[in-house]
Each structure stands twice: as C-alpha cells, then as structure tokens.
Amino acid sequence: MTTTAFAFVLAAYLIGSLSFAVIVSKAMGMADPRSYGSGNPGATNVLRTGKKLAAALTLLGDGAKGWVAVALASWLGPRYGLGEQGIALCALAVLFGHMWPVFFGFKGGKGVATAVGILFGINPWLALAALATWLFMAFVVKISSLSAIVACVLAPVYAFFILGPHSVYFGTCIIIAIVVVHRHKSNLIKLMTGQEDKIGNKGDAG
C-alpha cells in the first residue's frame, strides 16, 4: 500500500469512528446509547428513548459519513494516484471505523446506515436498490434486523448486475454484506428462535 493510499484509508477509518449515536445523544443531554436497550450505538437503539429527532440525526450522520468517505476518495484520490482498489479500501475502512471506532473504545454499531451511505458513494442506483429492499421487507415482515440482513445479502447481487462481476466494488459489496450480517449474529439467533421483536417494539435490532 502506498503512503497516499494509507492516508486516505486512515482518514476514512477516522471518519467512520465518529459515532453519531454517542455524539448526538451527548449533545442533546441524553444517556449514552451503549448503556441501555441493545447497547448498540445506532439509530434504532436511540429511537428507543422516544427521541425521534436524535434517532433521525444519528441515522443521517451514520449514513452521511459512509458517503463522505467514499465520495472524497473518489473525487480527490485520483489526483494523488488513488485507484478503484484504494477507494474500495476506503469504503471498507469507514465501515470498520463505524463498527470499531477508535474514539469510542472500539465499541460501535452494526453498520447498516453507514453501509447504505457507502453504496450511495459507489453507485446511487445500487444504494437505492438496497434501500428499496429494506423498505419492502420492513413493510412486509416489520422486523428491522431481518430487513437489514436481506438488503445486505442482496446488495452484492445488485452490484453484480449494476456494476458487473469484474468490478472491484462487487467484491467490496460481498465483504460489506458478510461483515454487516455477522454483526447481526445476535439478531439471527433471535430470528431463529422467534424472539426477535418487530419494528416499534423493544428489542435488539439497533
């Protein structure tokens, strides 16, 4: 890895390490989202407080940082010799930063909103396809975690058709899907045992 690529990847990781669930909650005088509910610093868990604005700001912040990291790498990177592989690494770095943030004790979220932001940075149509899948599943089954898992699993399929099997971002989407689904392992166990709560109820989908 070149020094330039390392700098961009490190910057992406640091951007990802900005946990908006914690930042927004602290700014609004709320408890640390890691101390209640599922313990997950994400929009769903913040919503459990009943503070819809805080949850919305968390969702937007987590999604925006995924887009910003990829967009900056895409716009500025080529000027310094950063190719698509380097941009793909930045996409993964911002996601890993969200999940294991250096600024917050490496205890981060599950990455759904950030993953969507990353997809928007890669290709808006790809992101819209994944987002539409989540919305459709949420409407049908009304389970946030299952909707997120299905959307993540199908994202590489959409990438295959939209970007092509030889695109470096196709591989990136596969890695994102694997990591995000793995972060939902506790939700998968609850889904298999019929204990996962539906949207609007208290649970661990955040």
UniProtKB/Swiss-Prot annotation:
Tell me the pathway: Lipid metabolism; phospholipid metabolism
Q: Which InterPro entries match?
A: G3P_acylTferase_PlsY
**Known catalytic reactions:** an acyl phosphate + sn-glycerol 3-phosphate = a 1-acyl-sn-glycero-3-phosphate + phosphate
- List the EC numbers from the record: 2.3.1.275
Q: Does the keyword Plastid apply?
A: no
Q: Name one Pfam family in it.
A: G3P_acyltransf
Molecular function as annotated in GO: acyl-phosphate glycerol-3-phosphate acyltransferase activity
Q: Subcellular location, in the record's words?
A: Cell inner membrane
Top-level EC class, please? Answer: transferase
Q: How does it sit in the membrane?
A: Multi-pass membrane protein
Q: Which GO terms describe its cellular component?
A: plasma membrane
Single GO BP term: phospholipid biosynthetic process
Under the subunit heading, UniProt states: Probably interacts with PlsX.
Task: Give the matching NCBIfam families.
Answer: glycerol-3-phosphate 1-O-acyltransferase PlsY
Protein name (database record):
Glycerol-3-phosphate acyltransferase
- Tell me the lineage of the source organism: Bacteria, Pseudomonadati, Pseudomonadota, Betaproteobacteria, Neisseriales
